[in-house]
Amino acid sequence: MKPIPSESSVRMPFVSTRQALSRRRFLVGSGIALSLPFLESMSPAFARGAEKAPATPRRMFAICNNLGLLPEEFFPKTTGRGYTPSPYLEALRDHRDQFTVFSGVSHPDVDGGHPADNCFLTAAPHPGSGGFRNTISLDQYIAERIGHLTRFPSLNLGVNVDRGARSLSWTGSGVLIPCEEKASDVFRRLFLQGSAAETENQVRKLELGQSILDAVAGQATTLKKNVSGADRDRLDQYFTSVRELEQRMQMSREWERKPKPAVSASVPLDPESPRDYMEKVRLMYDLARLAFETDSTRSIALLLDSVNSPVIELGDTKLTEAYHNLSHHGRSEAKIAQLKAIDLWHMQLISGMLTELKRVKEQGDTLLDRTMILYGSNLGNANTHVTTNLPILFAGGGFKHGQHLAFDTQRNYPLPNLFVSMLQRMGIESDKFASSTGTMRGLEMA
C-alpha cells in the first residue's frame, strides 16, 4: 500500500513560479484519504531543461449490459457523419459529436448466448463449449501495463451480478475477477483509509448525513487559499460532486426503511434490493467519474447483469415481468414497450454521465476528452441470443466522433480492432488483441 502523506504536506504556498503540487496529493483526516483532482498548480509554469509537466492521463471505462438493446430502436437507418439518429440515440443528441455508434461488429467465434458476456472484454472464442478457458480482458491488459501509475490498477464493478459466474474482468490465466457490487464498498476503497474503527466511524457519520469532507475541511480551506482562482473553482466543483454522491447514496436507501422510529443501527449506504437496478447503475457511473477525476485508476469495467435482475423499479413506469423475461419478448407489443422504457432509461443515464464528464476540466480538455467510454453488449438480439451485430457505442477519449460506422451485418467486422485502437490511445504500444486484424477502420484520433 502506498504511504499516505502527512497533513502538513498539503500546506505548500502557491507562488508565481508555480512550484508544482504533487499529483499524488491527498487531504488526510481520521479514516480519510481524499484524493485531489488534477489542478494546474500540480504542473510547473516553466519547464527546466528536459523537465516536462506530467502528461494528462487517459482512461478507459467499459460497460456491458448483457441483455443488450432492441436493435430496431438502437441502430440508425443511415450511415456516416450525417446519419439520422435512431430513437435511442435521440436521448444522446446533446452529445452527438462526442460519440460514434457502430453496427455490423462482433467478436469472431464468440457464441453461446448468455455466456458470451464473460467474453465481452476478452473476445475468447466459444465460451459455451466444454473445456472453455477465458483469456485476459481489456481492462486487465491495460492494468498490467499502466496500473502501477495509480492507486488502484483497475476497478471491476457490477450491478446485480451472478458472482462467481459472471465478470468482465479476467486475468491472463483465465481466472475470473469478482465484481464489486456495493457502492459503499467502492466508496470506502476510494475515500476511506485508516484503522477498522476509524473507517467504521466515518461510515456511521455518512449514514447520519455527515460528510467525509468535514474531516478535511481545514486542510481544504488552506489549500484553496494557496492555489489559483481556476484551481479554487475546480476544487469547489470536485468537493460538491463528492458531497452530492454521498447524499445520493444516503437517499437511495430511504425508500427501503420501514415506517418506525429512527435508530442508531448501521444502515447500508447503497440500495440492496436488486429491483433498484437503475439507481445502482447511476451510483456506479458517479463513482467511476470520481475515480477518474482523482486519478485513482485509469481502467474500469462495469457489468450490468440484466440477466440476473428481477422486475426492476423504473420511476412511474410499471413493469410486469423480470428484465430477462422481457428480453424474450417474442414480438409481444406489451413486452417490447416495457423494454423500450428500460432501454431509454439506460440511454438517459449514459447521457447524464457524459454531461458530468464534460463539466470536469483538465488541462484545457474535459474529462470526457481524456476518457474512452465503451458501452455495449455481448448480445446483438437478446430475444434470440444472437451474438453478432452487437450494439456498440463509443464516446470520448479524443477521437473524431459524430458518426455511424456501419459494417456488414452478415459478415461482421472484428470488434477487437476497436480494442487495439483504444490501447494505442492509452499510450500502450500494441498492434494485436485477441482476434483483431488491426485498428478500427474509420475511427481517427482527434
Task: Provide a role label for each language-model segment.
Residues K2-A446:
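Ligand-binding pockets and gating/stacking loops
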